[in-house]
Amino acid sequence: KPAGRKKFQETRHPIYRGVRLRKSGKWVCEVREPNKKSRIWLGTFK
């Protein structure tokens, strides 16, 4: 399943699954297990 092809053109940076930009300008990364609702937190990046 492609993750956000339209957003790629709008924001001009690659969109990775589980990676998003917060309002504060920091990138956050997390992974979700398909069978569970729990998330594995990978961290925050500038």
From Swiss-Prot:
This entry's Gene Ontology molecular function terms read:
DNA binding; DNA-binding transcription factor activity
Q: Main site of residence?
A: nucleus
Protein location: Nucleus
Keywords from UniProt, A to Z, are: Activator, DNA-binding, Nucleus, Stress response, Transcription, Transcription regulation
According to the UniProt record, which residues make up the DNA-binding region?
15-46
- Cross-referenced InterPro entries, in alphabetical order? AP2/ERF_dom (IPR001471), AP2/ERF_dom_sf (IPR036955), DNA-bd_dom_sf (IPR016177), DRE1A-I (IPR045277)
A single GO cellular-component term from the record reads:
nucleus
Question: Tell me, what does this protein do in biology?
Answer: Transcriptional activator that binds specifically to the DNA sequence 5'-[AG]CCGAC-3'.
Similarity comment: family membership: Belongs to the AP2/ERF transcription factor family. ERF subfamily.
Return the protein name.
Answer: Dehydration-responsive element-binding protein 1
